[in-house]
Amino acid sequence: MRRLALLLAGVAGVAVAAAPGTAEARAKVHVMVVGKSAVLAGPERVALKARTARVGGKRCSIGRATPLSVLAGTGVSFSLKDYGACSSRARDAGSLYVRRIGPDRESGTDGWVYKVGRRAGSGGAADPAGSFGTGRKLRRDQHVLWFWCVKDAADSCQRTLEVKPARERAEPGAALQVTVRGYDDSGDGVRVEGALVRLGDAAALTGADGAATLTAPAAGSYRLQAEKPGMVVSFPVRVAVG
């Protein structure tokens, strides 16, 4: 399946290799795993570490700054198939393919895909050439989304949502405008009508312009998130009230 996540996971066991004691080695990225009907892991920050996983009867190394490694770092159960010859060398992991995450296993043309930022990766999830074949690996504070892809007639996945508040601090009872966009595999976005946005106990639907206005709840720190049937729920954005 085109672009469906390559990587590995054998049966649960993922061992973390020792990481160099540098600032780079301590870098983390934001990760979320969204299945057919539920969020399976995250959102959370996961360290960029070299990891290993068992595939069949052998243990294979996975490069530290790859979507497959951070998937393993969430602790979610997953299984992989090796279409190459993975080994103790991370450079051999480029053909690992993710067949299952949690209860959701590939079926027909539907299966697991990852995005880095807004774009679907064009390379294997543990490919040493990077997610887009440029040699660039994951970097500190990037967003990595694993999601269950339902292919359409054009061989594209459903859009993934992104919610943006007009500001990230508001007073209780104040109006807060938010905008929701949906991004395709290439990272091209459109404003989304009919998305449900939530901030604590406040909720609203977006209009044709992709915008909605929420009434800020009581003082506190809240996650702002957007969802719509047929699209992938957004990463949450933290909003401070009060």
Located regions from the model:
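Secretory targeting and sorting signals
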Residues: 1-24
